[in-house]
Amino acid sequence: NIKMANDYSDGLLLSIQADVSNLKDEPPKTPEVTNLVQTISFSDMNRWEVAYILKEGKLEKVYKSFKYPSYEISQLQKESLFGLSSKASLTQKDGMIPMLRMPNIVNGEIDCSQLKYLPKSSATTANEPDKWLLKKGDFLINRTNSKELVGKSAIFNLDGDYTYASYLIRYRFDTSLVLPEYVNILFMLPLVRKQIDAVSRQTAGQCNINSDEIGAIRIPVPSIPIQQEIIKKYFDAKDGANNYYAKADECKTNALINFEKEIF
């Protein structure tokens, strides 16, 4: 049942990608070796510059596959802000609020199972009392993590006061152009993951992507009604995958109960 749920989820994401893009995954080509040694000048080694990646055509296929007008994230955002670097506590005391961190972004959603807390006053300033307080609809993206998890995102839709840690960046979009739930879905698709993989850098065992690189990520942006249809398609189908996972958990529990009966 878990495999069926995973296949269901993967199929859903590829189906949504087909709605907005003609991108098809192809097996990597093995480069032809013509020389054992090749001299490369230092000026050609700007590996992590977006311009270099574009020049080499690494992502042109992705951009050309879009079925709708292409926008950079920086063109869609109204504002963005790095999170707090304040030390958080495992125990919530009076005046403290939850701080969302890297482990709290799981499969495109907020997971509240490993929360830490810090004083609400740490998330405010005299001039901006709500500066680091999250609002419903905020888009959170993980800027530092493993290669597979860097760039993972989620939409904040919880009740109450929450803030977020420095390894996350919070975006607020111009909702007359794009809906945050739509952006979040696209950040789970290969057409965005390929862009993140191309620009992320590994240092000290962690991969990083900065705000400029996130801002340069391009996505296809259809009309708001079409975005709403895609969002509905995602959540309606996601319920089906969740049913598979629930059934798998039920089977696992029953198997353990039966095992204990046989042993004891």
For every predicted segment, state its role.
Residues 60-110, 129, 202:
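Low-complexity, Lys/Gly-biased intrinsically disordered segments
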Residues 60-61, 95, 151, 163-166, ...:
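Short edge beta-strand segments in beta-sheet-rich domains
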Residues 106-120, 142, 162:
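Short, basic/aromatic beta-hairpin or loop at an interaction surface
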